[in-house]
């Protein structure tokens, strides 16, 4: 049973995958998207679901610090609903508050250059989201 983790932004979707036992999350890739043109990366996500035999997807839900859901959170909920309908899979939302900051701290502590951090931050945020979900089980 593999689980895909997604950090959905306005320009990219960070992707992480669990191991087969569902214990650890590894960064996979970052998919470029364009919301204005209706390009959400669903084709690539579908390919990854087939390639890795995924049976569940975890989508990060950005909440405000007071727990409310703003416009970005609503967009992520719609993204998740579209995935659920398209792929006929279990798609769950996971509170992603501070996941990007946690990913940034991990990369800084690993002495990753600013340029390289910018390239992998979304993928690492997806890892933080997915690992949080896996650890809760």
From Swiss-Prot:
Coiled coil: none
Record InterPro entries: RNaseH-like_sf (IPR012337), YqgF (IPR005227), YqgF/RNaseH-like_dom (IPR006641), YqgF/RNaseH-like_dom_sf (IPR037027)
Domain of life (superkingdom): Bacteria
Gene Ontology BP annotations: rRNA 5'-end processing
CDD domains, alphabetized: YqgF
Disulfide topology: none
Compartments where found: Cytoplasm
Family (UniProt): Belongs to the YqgF nuclease family.
Protein name in UniProt: Putative pre-16S rRNA nuclease
Native source species: Bacillus anthracis
Lineage, uppermost ranks: Bacteria, Bacillati, Bacillota, Bacilli, Bacillales
